[in-house]
Swiss-Prot record:
NCBIfam families in UniProt: PRK11556.1 (NF008589), RND_mfp (TIGR01730)
Biased composition (Basic and acidic residues): 397-413
Quaternary structure annotation from Swiss-Prot or TrEMBL: Part of a tripartite efflux system composed of MdtA, MdtB and MdtC.
GO MF term (any one): efflux transmembrane transporter activity
Region of interest (Disordered), residue spans: 31-57, 391-413
Family: Belongs to the membrane fusion protein (MFP) (TC 8.A.1) family.
Matching PANTHER family: MULTIDRUG RESISTANCE PROTEIN MDTA
Keyword tags: Cell inner membrane, Cell membrane, Membrane, Signal, Transport
Name recorded for this polypeptide: Multidrug resistance protein MdtA
Length: 413
């Protein structure tokens, strides 16, 4: 029994030793092949990487050619449309409102009848004044006849000098009374005329402030209706104080400075007008100055209190080198562009920019007309890399400059 157990233990130990020997032999046989494989793989990968950079697909980019153009310079600001005149129409006499002769929102001309106050009392007052004037005119005529008789009698000493002077004084007094009567007639006529309320200016009427049948007074602050003059209409916008010298210089040159009004999104031009005036002082809290422009507004595209973006043309730069705005990048060293040579190799070039908008940028220094610049695919570029221009080149000359939908930067130099 003991010998049998010893035999079984010997067999088990032999199996374990055999398995260990097999594992050791197998691992030793694979190790020499694996290591050279790994060692060989690294140079192969590096070599393949270099070949990929040299012989692999080229980075696709889009490009444009710098051109020369006459580029307008704009100054931009935010503004609000204001009526050229705003008038609250009030009655100048007291009475009952018996008629309104306008439709709310209607365009009216100066002198058009807007409302009617009951004229009855004013007609009566006028008739009374006219009657008193007629009475005093008759009195004056009689006094003048008496004076003429006194003057004849005085020549023969039939009346005293005192009586003659008294009659002359009566005539003078009656003449003074008549002047007062004439003034009363004019006043009564004026009151009657004022019962017809007319438009003091041309413009658009707003909503009525009082209904027919109400008793109104000259002291009413709300008035009857408000008229805003919109033909022409004004735009008040602000510019930084640093732009004042540019505007004043352009004015002194005798230029009629054109001002454009654009919508809130700066994508649609609403109207075009001219500079009217500058304010006489700078706002110390904002460092800006108010500027007023005037627009004919015959198409009613501008409305009082409307918010707009204003652009004022102050100068035009001739023969400016222009590239698309997408080509200009900003780095630690300043603005730069990627320039393409004849072999489509790219190189970074520092530039100095001038007038710019959302589409185009004037290059003041660093580029020449005819240079090709990368406009898309810039993030994949390295110095000296060869690239592939994937789309036909487009020249900036094919685009209007400045853009007709530029933002605020489109006005800055």
């Amino acid at each position: 029994m003991k010998g049998s157990n010893t035999f079984r233990w010997a067999i088990a130990i032999g199996v374990v030793v055999a398995a260990a020997a097999f594992w050791f032999w197998h691992s030793r046989s694979e190790s020499p092949t694996a290591a050279p494989g790994v060692a060989a793989q690294a140079p192969h990968t590096a070599s393949a990487g270099r070949r990929g950079m040299r012989d692999g697909p080229l980075a696709p980019v889009q490009a444009a050619t710098a051109t020369t153009q006459a580029v307008p310079r704009y100054l931009s600001g935010l503004g609000t449309v204001t009526a050229a005149n705003t008038v609250t129409v009030r009655s100048r006499v007291d009475g009952q409102l018996i008629a309104l002769h306008f439709q709310e929102g209607q365009q009216v001309n100066a002198g058009d009848l807007l409302a009617q106050i009951d004229p009855s009392q004013f007609k009566v007052a006028l008739a009374q004044a006219q009657g008193q004037l007629a009475k005093d005119n008759a009195t004056l005529a009689n006094a003048r006849r008496d004076l003429a008789r006194y003057q004849q009698l005085a020549k023969t000493n039939l009346v005293s000098r005192q009586e003659l002077d008294a009659q002359q004084a009566l005539v003078n007094e009656t003449q003074g009374t008549i002047k007062a009567d004439e003034a009363n007639v004019a006043s009564a006529q004026l009151q009657l005329d004022w019962s017809r309320i007319t438009a003091p200016v041309s413009g658009r009427v707003g909503l009525k402030q009082v209904d027919v049948g109400n008793q109104i007074s000259s002291s009413d602050t709300a008035g009857i209706v408000v008229i805003t003059q919109t033909h022409p209409i004004d735009l008040i916008f602000t510019l930084p104080e640093s732009d004042i010298a540019t505007v004043v210089q352009a004015q002194k040159a005798g230029k009629a400075l054109v001002v454009e009004a654009w919508d809130r999104t700066n994508s649609h031009k609403l109207s075009e007008g001219v500079l009217l005036s500058l304010d006489n002082q700078i706002d110390p809290t904002t460092g800006t100055i108010k500027i007023k422009a005037r627009f004919t507004n015959q198409d009613d595209t501008l409305f009082p209190n409307q918010f707009v973006n204003a652009r004022m043309l102050v100068d035009t730069e001739q023969n400016a080198v222009v590239v698309p705005a997408a080509a200009v990048q900003m780095g630690n060293e300043g603005h730069f562009v990627w320039v393409l040579n004849d072999e489509n190799n790219v190189s970074k070039k520092r530039v100095k920019i001038g007038i710019q908008d959302n589409r185009n940028v004037v290059i003041s220094a660093g580029l020449s007309a005819g240079d090709r610049v990368v406009t898309d695919g810039i993030d994949r570029l390295t110095e000296g890399a060869k690239v592939e221009v994937v789309e036909p080149q487009t020249t900036v000359a094919d685009e209007k400059s400045p853009s007709r939908h530029e933002g605020q930067k489109g006005a800055r130099a």
